[in-house]
């Protein structure tokens, strides 16, 4: 199980939102490339980037910063989410050196788009499912749909989606602990590996997720916890490697 540091980009800065609210953000760094260096130095093997402006505008806004990080660390697998709604955007990021793109809102509203993109860019497509009480939320979490997250996962099973980033939005950025049961339910709904996101606070969460990792959980994204120091990224990864 990989520990995946998150760098959330807003107006070129590295921030964290609480429950996805753009006006409730904390700036952690105005140099995202240097921020990435900190996690690389601690041994991170994958980086999770989010273009927050892009998620709300539906097109890349912080693409220049993403490209700069990818160029600075060419051997590091990077996944990017936020505002990915077209083949042109996916191509832009992959050519910039990003390994995987995360399709969120469009995956819910237009599942055929995921099917098509998996064919066009095999092995590079991740689906981001953000859920509240099991129901999928879209458009930067502004809308909650009538689609169940587990049903959508089953739909993408045949498409060749490389993984699902599953976020429990009630817990994201709140430091209240990860929703292990909801993550396990998602992992067992399909054969697609699941990356847990939202609410990871300390080693207790890592231990709880790792204990269930054999059910299909391949990674854990952490943001606020590693920035505020309640979780040590290197220690968490060492624990996952040893157990």
Curated annotation (Swiss-Prot):
Pathway: Amino-acid biosynthesis; L-histidine biosynthesis; L-histidine from 5-phospho-alpha-D-ribose 1-diphosphate: step 4/9. It catalyses: 1-(5-phospho-beta-D-ribosyl)-5-[(5-phospho-beta-D-ribosylamino)methylideneamino]imidazole-4-carboxamide = 5-[(5-phospho-1-deoxy-D-ribulos-1-ylimino)methylamino]-1-(5-phospho-beta-D-ribosyl)imidazole-4-carboxamide. Disulfide bonds: none annotated. One of its GO terms (biological process) is L-tryptophan biosynthetic process. Pfam families: His_biosynth. It is found in: Cytoplasm. One of its GO terms (cellular component) is cytoplasm. Belongs to the HisA/HisF family. This is 1-(5-phosphoribosyl)-5-[(5-phosphoribosylamino)methylideneamino] imidazole-4-carboxamide isomerase. The gene is hisA.
